[in-house]
Amino acid sequence: MTRPAVFLDRDGTLIEEAGYLDRLERLVFFPYSVDAVRALNRSGFAVVIVTNQAGIARGIFKEPFVAEAHGYITRRLAAGGAHIDGFYYCPHHPDGKVEAFTKACECRKPAPGMLTAAAADLDLDLSKSFMIGDRWHDLAAGAAVGVRGVLVRTGYGRTEEASPKEVTPAAIVDNLVDAVSWILRES
């Protein structure tokens, strides 16, 4: 059963931008995030987080913390009747300090590796899918595999909107709930 997905950037899109999120106390949901994810769940979309986590390569935090943060997100969404179908993260950065994660890779956005991995794992139809993010490189990852992108003005979005476009978005909206409303109208 191939189904469409909505790929979500994590920081600045689903949750507030906190720089390198290295403690759960700094993980703050936008007030509308649970409702937005639940609306996507009910509409039949797979909801997949795709997030660059260069803090691992830079030695700021370790991989178990990413799993802990994603567990917290899962529990918080479940309490509101919502869920994420898959979490994908890239631990790499070409200028890292931790040798095992210091490299150029195909998973770090704007490369589409996390999206293609999710599509294979979850049997997703990329041609009917969307990418929501607050940075041009989020949307570029989607565009590389034919996924339409929606830029949100939360996180780095307002700054990105004012900078030269790396990719042409299908829409630019204020926040995640507006992006979900736009997607549900378009599909």
Question: In which residue ranges do the predicted regions lie?
Answer:
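Structural recognition of alpha->loop->beta junctions
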Residues: H70-Y89, A162-L184
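Metal-dependent phosphoesterase signature
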Residues: L14-F30, I56-F65, A79-H83, V98-C107
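Acidic, Mg2+-coordinating phosphoryl-transfer loop and its flanking beta/alpha structural elements
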Residues: S127-A171
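Substrate-recognition element of Asp-dependent hydrolases with the DxDx(T/V) motif
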Residues: S33, V37-I73, A82-G96, G142
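Active-site neighborhood of HAD-like aspartate-dependent phosphohydrolases
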Residues: M1-I49
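Conserved Lys-Pro-Asp/Glu-containing loop-to-beta segment of HAD-superfamily phosphomonoesterases
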Residues: E106-L139
